[in-house]
Amino acid sequence: MTEQSKSLFYASEPPKIRASESNHWYTRDGIPQYTIVGKNGKERNTTLRDAREHNYIPSVTTVLGVANKPALVAWMQTQVLMAALTSTKREGESEQDYIDRIIQDSKQQGRDAADLGTEIHTAIESFFEGISHDKHQEHVQGCVRSLEEQYGRVGWIAERSFGHELGFAGKCDLHATNDAIGNGIVVDIKTKDFTDPKDVVGYDEHLMQLSAYRVGLGIPNARCANIFVSRTQAGLCKIIEWSEEDLQRGFEMFCSLLKFWQLKNKHK
């Protein structure tokens, strides 16, 4: 039995959870467990300690978090420099307080972009789930149009969560179990600031995520693509479809990261 053919589990009715996925935990059969009720009776984010206790498994994106992301690091450095250029030291402010304020200001830029991206992503997700949503309709229609131009009319399944025997889980934005060539399609939606599609490129992180999703969903030969939705120009999108050779390489890389994550965290 190959790694890609090992048993997997689906959440029969994927919960419509819009909570933060910052902790990215799932039950073995694919039910999201982003939060947990603590001993004090209050809801809080699920931790690694909780995961060990309840036998939860990490999401694909949590596993990918152990890998260095040079593009993200460069972007964060730029945000800090921009915040420093637009902020002056206040009278009586200590060096450390000034540095802390610059760092917080730089993080706010990222939070603002992330918040807008989440809103757009939610609007697109709602469309494919058949849920009425009034915001960001130009972004939604641009995404729908781009997917139809690329793949034709496909019976998309939105936000399906899964758990896999190898010890990883996740929730896929869009997938179809069959298409014109019969192997299925897996699509991950990304929002990004861009006005020229030529500026948009895919990274190994995207490749690994999609390759793990298709295995987790039980369609290991599916086509895989990222659709990048512009935050700055409503309706503008770019689709990057990965080759089968890249996807095979991506899954090998992901399995290496998964093994590292499990050993590092002493949790399988």
In which residue ranges do the predicted regions lie?
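Mg2+/Mn2+-dependent nuclease catalytic core
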Residues: 156-265
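Acidic, carboxylate-rich catalytic segments that either coordinate divalent cations
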Residues: 268
